[in-house]
Each structure stands twice: as C-alpha cells, then as structure tokens.
C-alpha cells in the first residue's frame, strides 16, 4: 500500500512530504518530477507568486544513487515567498475556510487556516504524484489532462468528440491547456476581463488515464471501489466541487440502452466500441481508458471583495484580500493528473505487490499471461 502525508504552510519555510510504499529499485527521474512541478506553476491567470517560486524537490531519504530503496521517501520543497508573520485575517472570505477553520480550532482569525488550506500545499502533492507517475510509466500507463471549459467558454463539441491520445500530448502548446484555438482566444479574453473587474473564474477539467489494466479496485466492499477512491482524491483538491466518470451526469436523462457499453470479442480479447462508463464498472477498471471530469469553482479571493463580518468587531465589512490567482483551472488539471497517478499507483502496488520493482513487474506480467488464457 502506498500512502503519503504532507506538511507546511503557504508562507512558511517550505513543504514537507513523506511517501511510503514505493517498491525498491525504481529509477528516480528527478527532471521528470521537477517538470511536473513546473507544469503546475504555469497557466494564464496565475498570481505574481508564480514568478517568485521555482519549485524543485530535495530528497532527504528513500533514494540512493537515483533508485528507490523501499524506505519511506521524504521530500522538501522550499518556499521563497516566506512571511509567516503576515497580518491576521479577521475579515473571512466567503467561499474559503477562514471562518469555519478559525471557529473549529479556536483561532482569533483565519491566518493559520489559510496558510494550510492554501493551494500551495498541492505543490507537494504534485511531487508525490510525479513519483507515482514514474512507477506507472514502467507499466506503460500514462495520464493526461486538458481543459474543456473556463467560465462560459467551452471547447467545441466537434473538437472534443474527435480528441485522440496523440492530441493529449499537445496541451503544452496552449497557455490554458485547451485543444481548441478559437476557444483559447475567448478564454484569454475572459480571464483578462475577470482580472480587470476584480473577479475570478472556474472551469471544467478532464483527466484521462490510458493503458489501464483490467482489475484495479474491487466490487467486494464500498471502500475498495476504484471510482470511490479516485473521487475522494480529486475532491480533496482545493476548489473542486464535483466529479463525474464517463458520460457522468448526462446519463440521468438517457435510457439504459443509450448508456451502457456493449461488449465484443476479437483477436485481442474482450473490448468495447464505446467508453460511456469512463473505464470503471462496479468499482473495477475494465481495461478502457479512465475518463473523469472535475468542476472547479471560481477562486474565493476577490480584488473586489464580497461582504463579510469582522470577527473582532462583529460589524459588516468587506472580505480581506490576499494575493491570489484569477484562474487556476489549468494548474488544477496538473494536480488532478497527479492525484489520479497516486490512486492508480496505489492500486497497482496493492494488486501486484512486491518489495522490489522487479518482483512487482514479474507479478504484473504473470497476471497478463493469465488474462490472455481467458481471451
């Protein structure tokens, strides 16, 4: 089993992560992990802080001579924008955890809350997910994401319906990670407009896991279902308010005959011509791509603040402003990729086990051979 913990505050000295359960002898490609961190920092609509920070990991343990040892991997990412003694937040922001967190932990204001609830913490999650991606790519499993909507602007249905795996490598060409050039222009305009008006924008992310083997997850108990684990991990990303798999919410208005993926058999075994289920049935991966969409709300920190109440005076006032993004949807898509990577890596280790990568690979290959006999 793979598990992790993170620690650190947004304006503290740095972030700390501990990742346990990665088998020994996995090549640690530091450039790959640092590139994942760089991808998270990019995107139109980010705050000035992205020009300050240059996220790179420092490995303290669990790696020797570029290979994992099987011991817990401890990671540090330093903060350059450090100032933990910033002014107290007594004017809580609607939509953020300032008020509820301060009341729960008996703080005078929301400073201690926002320092930890900040999306800055997701930098460490991306580093951890990056290591999980290294494990997955050894089994030819890859994870992609792209943006299908920001604000009211959606990519065209024609382009969306014709996206293939080769297209998914091209999202880096877009500053907002969309595969529709016309939509990209409109999105950039909407982000500029929101910034000018002191407002923020949300959107919809699509994340796709490819070459997923049959049999990850389980139908035997509620807490072992793969889609449940994925939903939990994606919903834990700051600002994410909903998730769907495959056709998702649109299935509510369709007939069963229009929704379920018919099963066929050919030279390569069982297959489906459609993937309306999004690659998971009864909590188990079915061999198709895993396709999920997540909805991100607009960021709650506004330059034109909403009404709130001062926690000291109890008088009506305007919410406090902190340096923040106008739109973080492109960045959130990278976080979502790496959260999916964590879940899938955990499931791979759970199913194919082994203390070393070599042992895990043998178990995986034996499983594929067994499946071939059933084809």
Feature locations, PLM:
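Generic N-terminal targeting/processing segments that precede catalytic cores or assembly contacts
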Residues: 1-375
């Amino acid at each position: 089993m793979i598990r992790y913990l993170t620690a650190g505050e947004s304006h503290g000295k740095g972030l700390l992560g501990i990742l346990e359960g990665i088998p020994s002898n996995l090549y640690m490609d530091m450039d790959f992990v640092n590139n994942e961190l760089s991808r998270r920092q990019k995107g139109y609509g980010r705050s000035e802080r992205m020009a300050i920070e240059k996220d790179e990991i420092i490995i303290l343990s669990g790696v020797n001579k570029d290979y994992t040892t099987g011991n817990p991997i401890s990671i540090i990412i330093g903060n350059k924008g450090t100032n933990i003694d910033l002014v107290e937040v007594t004017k809580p922001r609607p939509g953020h955890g300032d008020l509820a967190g301060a009341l729960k932990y008996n703080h005078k204001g929301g400073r201690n809350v926002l320092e930890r609830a900040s999306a800055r913490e997701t930098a460490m999650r991306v580093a951890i997910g990056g290591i999980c991606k290294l494990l997955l790519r050894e089994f030819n499993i890859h994870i992609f994401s792209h943006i299908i909507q920001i604000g009211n602007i959606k990519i065209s249905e024609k382009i969306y319906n014709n996206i293939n795996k080769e297209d998914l490598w091209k999202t880096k060409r877009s500053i907002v990670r969309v595969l529709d050039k016309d939509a990209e222009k409109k999105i950039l305009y909407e982000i500029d407009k929101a910034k000018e008006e002191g407002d923020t924008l949300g959107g919809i992310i699509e994340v796709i896991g490819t070459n997923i083997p049959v049999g990850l997850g389980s139908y035997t108990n509620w807490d072992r279902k793969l889609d449940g684990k994925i939903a939990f991990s994606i919903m834990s990303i700051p600002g994410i308010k909903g998730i769907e798999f495959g056709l998702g919410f649109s299935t509510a208005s369709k007939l069963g005959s229009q929704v379920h993926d018919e099963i066929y058999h050919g030279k390569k075994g069982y297959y489906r011509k459609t993937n309306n289920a999004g690659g998971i049935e009864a909590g188990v991966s079915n061999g198709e791509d895993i396709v999920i969409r997540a909805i991100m709300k607009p960021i709650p920190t506004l330059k034109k603040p909403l009404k709130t109440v001062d926690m000291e005076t109890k008088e009506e006032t305007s919410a406090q402003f902190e340096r923040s993004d106008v739109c973080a949807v492109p960045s959130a898509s990278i976080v979502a990729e790496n959260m999916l990577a964590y879940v899938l890596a955990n499931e791979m280790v759970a199913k194919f086990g082994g203390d070393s990568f070599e042992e895990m690979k043998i178990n995986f290959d034996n499983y594929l051979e067994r499946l071939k006999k059933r084809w």
